[in-house]
Amino acid sequence: NLLFGQGTRGLQRYAKRGYGVDLTATEAERARTAFFRAYPGLSRWQAETRRHAERVGQVRTSGGRVRALEGQRALATESLNTPIQGGAAECLLAALAELNLDRWNAHLVNVVHDELVVECDPEPAGAVAAEVERAMVAGFLALFPEGGTRDLVEAHRGPNWAAAKG
């Protein structure tokens, strides 16, 4: 995707495969331009991260984990993917360390990418959802203390995971 340095052709393929939308090269390029205009800091970060990766042959996550990069493909994709995906994984690990479900007899049953799946009785579900949101925000702030948290986390509830995902 665009966060990881996707080009015009990649965006065309992504729109088609993911959403059934056919974009011309011109439309895809306009969409890319609009995206980076809306988030000017992102293109600067991408350029700086790639330059640094080319210079030192590695990239770091927010938590300090190092990934060695070998080859042009790694420099083009992994140099951007690792800090984002690795940082997200570190935030989730920090959230897990923060999470306290004991008082509600709630149980963590699955961790999927950026989601925590928790089972509990219906009565405390609102309080459990609030605790999950609190822990996830705390996990994010542990790595990005200056980061904005508005609309960062959104808990969903339902009788099962599929229903909660809506």
Identify the residue ranges that each predicted region occupies.
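Conserved catalytic core of nucleotide polymerization and phosphodiester-bond processing enzymes
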Residues: 1-166
